[in-house]
Curated annotation (Swiss-Prot):
One of its GO terms (biological process) is thiamine diphosphate biosynthetic process. It is an enzyme of class 4 (lyase). This is Phosphomethylpyrimidine synthase. It comes from Trichormus variabilis (strain ATCC 29413 / PCC 7937). InterPro entries: ThiC, ThiC/Bza_core_dom, ThiC/BzaA/B. GO terms for cellular component: cytosol. Zn(2+) binds at H279, H343.
Length: 457
């Protein structure tokens, strides 16, 4: 799709969407996004130029269908997939990708740490994906030194980061915000450091007594990203891993650094979004979103959850969707889904489905609350179909049509019930939606009430 679009850009020193936007150019990607979002193309360009919106679109991911992440666009959902040393393989991950796209994932992150050749898995996912692909290069950097964190060098990190960029990765989580001086701040936490990438870098700094190499070499990463139009997803290494640890000094110290790094990337026209927590009580979610906007100059916020309670293993797609809906309402640009397997194991296909649907609900609810143009149109259409007992239309408009039909057909499977004016909940005699009040009846009632009012006066 994008082959012709990017052909003329190849060989230029800076090919980022932000670079073109700041030159006043509306790229084909911006035009495409404008149509998808039903927004003016020049507004898209302005938002990208300001850094309030990103269009993650590596020039080597030519089958990508461009999309936007930002406060002016619809709230987006990311799905995580990825093989581990103990579970899954290349084909399973491609299948998960296809399932995630089917159920509405706006972006997909490949978090593979094993299960085969990581380069082959990543390439297969990118080649099959119409949505932006994100990665965490620290994982493969660690694999390249056979799991011995102390042996990692800055060059190891940069080599893997460039490899991912060359392969067509659209955004990379870069854990550059965790600094050596932040580490003592985790003493009072219950769960310490829960970011895998953050944990790797923390151990490296503790061993070498040196500053985070991703921080000291941030300019080198910028130069790589400029050449391929890779977006930063600045990782929150010190995100809280439980509600007790939310909004603490460690989290906020890193957030301040992430804001500084955001502005440094913007100096070179490189796109940025900022990752956020995590586990956050409901009363702290608004603070967290507004604090990020303040510290990071309104760069798009991308949050994991957040989970609003810690006591529901097996149901964390629910505990987190509650927080995600609130975060989206307050202005978060993208929600990273959580599956029922969170904290318990690697998600399978059904877990991916359940997590995604929970988060599509959260994002859609946020769009309605934020009064996005047309956000409620689908709800209204489904409500009309429900009132008219148009069962097939209800299924069609559902976020998960297969599940809706499956539940309906558990008790009333015959085709005749697809036109019935009841379901198995109320049966044929007690459904309140059978009470159809026509306009003539209401007019007569209004006349009667008016006369009654005159008599009372």
């Amino acid at each position: 799709m994008r082959t012709e679009w990017v052909a003329k850009r190849r060989g230029q020193g800076n090919v980022t969407q932000m670079h073109y936007a700041r030159q006043g150019v509306i790229t084909e990607e911006m035009q495409y996004v404008a149509q998808r979002e039903n927004l003016p193309a020049d507004l898209i360009r302005e938002e990208v130029a300001r850094g309030r919106m990103i269009i993650p679109a590596n020039i080597n991911h030519t089958n990508l269908e461009p999309m936007a992440i930002g406060i002016a666009s619809k709230c987006k959902v990311n799905a995580n997939i990825g093989a581990s040393p103990n579970s899954s393989n290349l084909q399973e991950e491609v299948d998960k990708l296809n399932l995630a796209v089917k159920y509405g994932a706006d972006t997909v992150m490949d978090l593979s740490t094993g299960g085969g050749n990581l380069d082959e898995i990543r390439t297969a996912i990118i080649n099959a994906s119409p949505v932006p692909i994100g990665t965490v290069p620290v994982y493969q950097a660690l694999e390249s030194v056979h799991g011995t964190i102390e042996n990692l060098t800055p060059e190891d990190f940069l080599h893997i980061i460039e490899k991912h960029a060359q392969q067509g990765v659209d955004y990379q989580t870069i854990h550059a915000g965790i600094l050596i001086e932040h580490l003592p701040l985790v003493r009072s936490r219950i769960t310490g450091i829960v970011s895998r990438g953050g944990g790797i870098l923390a151990r490296w700094m503790l061993h070498h007594h040196k500053q985070n190499p991703l921080y000291t070499h941030f300019r080198d990463i910028i130069e790589i990203f400029k050449r391929y139009d890779v977006s930063f997803s600045l990782g929150d290494s010190l995100r809280p891993g439980c509600t007790h640890d939310a909004s603490d000094d460690a989290q906020l110290a890193e957030l301040k650094t992430l804001g500084q790094l955001t502005r440094k990337a913007w100096e070179h026209d490189v796109q940025v979004m900022v990752e956020g927590p995590g586990h956050v009580p409901m009363d702290q979610i608004e603070f967290n979103v507004k604090k990020q906007m303040e510290e990071c100059s309104e760069a798009p916020f991308y949050v994991l959850g957040p989970l609003v309670t810690d006591i529901a293993p097996g149901y964390d797609h629910i505990t987190s969707a509650i927080g995600a809906a609130m975060a989206g309402w307050y202005g978060t640009a993208m929600l990273c889904y959580v599956t029922p397997k969170e904290h318990l194991g690697l998600p399978n296909a059904e877990d991916v489905r359940n997590g995604l649907i929970a988060y599509k609900i959260a994002a859609h609810a946020a769009d309605i609350a934020r009064h996005r143009p047309g956000a409620r149109d689908r709800d209204d259409e489904l409500s009309k179909a429900r009132y008219n007992f148009d069962w097939n239309r209800q299924f069609e408009l559902s976020l998960d049509p297969e599940r809706a039909k499956e539940y309906h057909d558990e008790t009333l499977p015959a085709d005749i019930y697809k036109t019935a004016e009841f379901c198995s909940m109320c049966g044929p005699k007690f459904c309140p939606m059978q009470t159809k009040v026509d306009a003539d009846a209401l007019t007569e009632l209004e006349k009667f009430l008016a006369k009654e009012k005159e008599v009372m006066i």
